[in-house]
């Protein structure tokens, strides 16, 4: 078995590919059970965010594991294959460390990915698909991420996706304080966005969510008006700015709904940021003249602001990561000797029990205890040394030299 990571992210695949391989919260447990249930992998954890879907696993059949991703999402492997990355052993470990530290994010140094990876581990634990190897790797991953964030300035002055959404809205409207804002969803991303937009004092804020109770909870925090998703067709036209990020597998806003809203607004423009993967807004909406539609990938230029000033922090972070990769792979290597050590100890225990039982019988017959102890010790010595001696004596000339060197090292022999 070996560590293996594979998937797609914003570096390798466009949004229309990423949304087809995303896993919803509801499908995660089924996906993990399906992957491990097919005995393609021994362990597995799935990280699925707006920017990446990647699978960390312990497997002897990497190619079959990769093929599972396409099969699970009912895709042709040939359509997905050009966008996939595959990382084995130390490269998989290094990738996990970089992702958790925010070095692989669209927003360099952003902290949200660490929480998302922790959620992925929690899901794998609940599904029973997290074994010793992945558990240890993720433990070290979270340790490294903490060290990178506390020892470097990697997160300093970073522009989050939420902040970028607000900045982009300001570029369109100039002043958000004169606009009405609608948030669709009530998860972490919407909560972050709401904080940035509300800080700019919009005229009115509405929160729409499938579960009205969650909309009400978020609305109370930001002095907003809660509504259900069913009210969107009537409410959409009242808002100038729409920010959406739900876990819906199907679009929330279609072209027809936006056309009706624009007509009601007498063609006053609407600014929409869709941070969801899969997308909440149909791609055809971009064809409407009075809609400024931005998807998550469209925010890349804004979130890269200030990147040049943090290159020193990136170098420091990479050094920390490289050191920890070496340490972790050393631990993995030592694990390979565990079965042999266990077998050796079990063999020794069998010898001990056999000789001890023999000694008890001799004592029961009234044999001299000193002679019994002598027999016990010589019996153990002979049993321990018989096989190594036999292997050395029957080895070929080429084998013998290596075996002699190995025995000298194992037993720390010094020839006088």
Swiss-Prot record:
Q: What is this protein called?
A: Glutamyl-tRNA reductase
What other note does the entry give for this protein? During catalysis, the active site Cys acts as a nucleophile attacking the alpha-carbonyl group of tRNA-bound glutamate with the formation of a thioester intermediate between enzyme and glutamate, and the concomitant release of tRNA(Glu). The thioester intermediate is finally reduced by direct hydride transfer from NADPH, to form the product GSA.
Which SUPFAM superfamilies does the UniProt entry name for this protein? Answer: Glutamyl tRNA-reductase catalytic, N-terminal domain (SSF69742), Glutamyl tRNA-reductase dimerization domain (SSF69075), NAD(P)-binding Rossmann-fold domains (SSF51735)
Q: Which GO terms describe its molecular function?
A: glutamyl-tRNA reductase activity; NADP binding
Annotated active site: 50 (nucleophile)
**PROSITE patterns registered for this protein in UniProt:** GLUTR (PS00747)
Give the pathway listed in the UniProt entry for this protein: Porphyrin-containing compound metabolism; protoporphyrin-IX biosynthesis; 5-aminolevulinate from L-glutamyl-tRNA(Glu): step 1/2
Any idea which positions bind substrate?
49-52, 105, 110-112, 116
Where does the entry annotate site (Important for activity)? 95
The subunit field of the Swiss-Prot or TrEMBL record says: Homodimer.
NCBIfam families with a match to the protein in the record: hemA
Give the family per the record. Belongs to the glutamyl-tRNA reductase family.
According to its UniProt entry, one GO biological process term is: protoporphyrinogen IX biosynthetic process from glutamate
> Catalysed reaction per UniProt?
(S)-4-amino-5-oxopentanoate + tRNA(Glu) + NADP(+) = L-glutamyl-tRNA(Glu) + NADPH + H(+)
Organism annotation:
Nitrosomonas europaea (strain ATCC 19718 / CIP 103999 / KCTC 2705 / NBRC 14298)
| Record's keyword annotation contains DNA damage | no
Q: Report the EC number(s), separated by commas if there are several.
A: 1.2.1.70
Function statement: Catalyzes the NADPH-dependent reduction of glutamyl-tRNA(Glu) to glutamate 1-semialdehyde (GSA).
Enzyme class per UniProt: oxidoreductase
Provide the residue positions that the database annotates as binding NADP(+). Answer: 185-190
Q: Which InterPro entries match?
A: 4pyrrol_synth_GluRdtase, 4pyrrol_synth_GluRdtase_dimer, 4pyrrol_synth_GluRdtase_N, GluRdtase_CS, GluRdtase_dimer_dom_sf, GluRdtase_N_sf, NAD(P)-bd_dom_sf, Shikm_DH/Glu-tRNA_Rdtase
């Amino acid at each position: 078995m070996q560590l293996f990571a594979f998937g797609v992210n914003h570096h390798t695949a466009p949004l229309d590919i990423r949304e087809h391989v995303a896993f919803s919260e509801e499908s995660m447990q089924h996906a993990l059970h399906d992957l491990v249930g097919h005995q393609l992998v021994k362990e597995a954890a799935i990280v699925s965010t707006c920017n990446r879907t990647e699978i960390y696993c312990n497997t002897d059949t990497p190619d079959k594991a990769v093929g599972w991703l396409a099969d699970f999402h009912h895709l042709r492997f040939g359509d997905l294959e050009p966008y996939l990355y595959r990382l084995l052993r130390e490269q998989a470990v290094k990738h996990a460390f970089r992702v958790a530290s925010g070095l692989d994010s669209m927003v360099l140094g952003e902290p949200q990915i660490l929480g998302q990876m922790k959620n992925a581990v929690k899901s794998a634990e609940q599904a029973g698909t997290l074994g010793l190897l992945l558990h240890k790797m993720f433990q070290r991953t979270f340790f490294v991420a903490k060290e990178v964030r506390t020892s470097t300035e990697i997160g300093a002055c970073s522009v989050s996706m939420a902040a970028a959404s607000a900045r982009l809205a300001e570029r369109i409207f100039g002043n958000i304080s004169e606009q009405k804002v609608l948030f669709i969803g009530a998860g972490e991303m919407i909560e972050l966005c709401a904080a940035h937009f509300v800080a700019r004092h919009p005229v009115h804020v509405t929160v729409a969510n499938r579960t009205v109770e969650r909309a009400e909870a978020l609305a109370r925090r930001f002095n907003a008006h809660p509504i259900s998703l069913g009210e969107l067709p009537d409410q959409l036209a009242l808002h100038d700015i729409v920010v959406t990020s739900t876990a819906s597998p199907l679009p929330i806003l279609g072209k027809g709904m936006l056309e009706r809203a624009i007509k009601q607004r007498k063609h006053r423009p609407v600014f929409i940021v869709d941070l969801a993967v899969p997308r909440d807004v149909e791609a055809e909406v971009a064809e409407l003249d009075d809609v400024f539609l931005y998807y998550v990938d469209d925010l890349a230029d804004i979130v890269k602001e200030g990147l040049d000033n943090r290159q020193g922090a990136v170098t420091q972070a990479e050094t920390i990561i490289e050191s920890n990769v070496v340490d972790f792979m050393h631990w993995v290597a030592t694990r390979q000797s565990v079965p042999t050590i266990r077998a050796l100890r079990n063999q020794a225990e069998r010898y001990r029990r056999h000789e001890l039982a023999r000694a008890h019988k001799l004592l029961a017959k009234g044999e001299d205890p000193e002679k019994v102890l002598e027999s016990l010790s010589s019996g153990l010595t002979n049993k321990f040394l018989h096989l190594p001696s036999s292997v050395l004596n029957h080895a070929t000339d080429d084998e013998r030299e290596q075996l002699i060197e190995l025995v000298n090292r194992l037993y720390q022999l010094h020839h006088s």
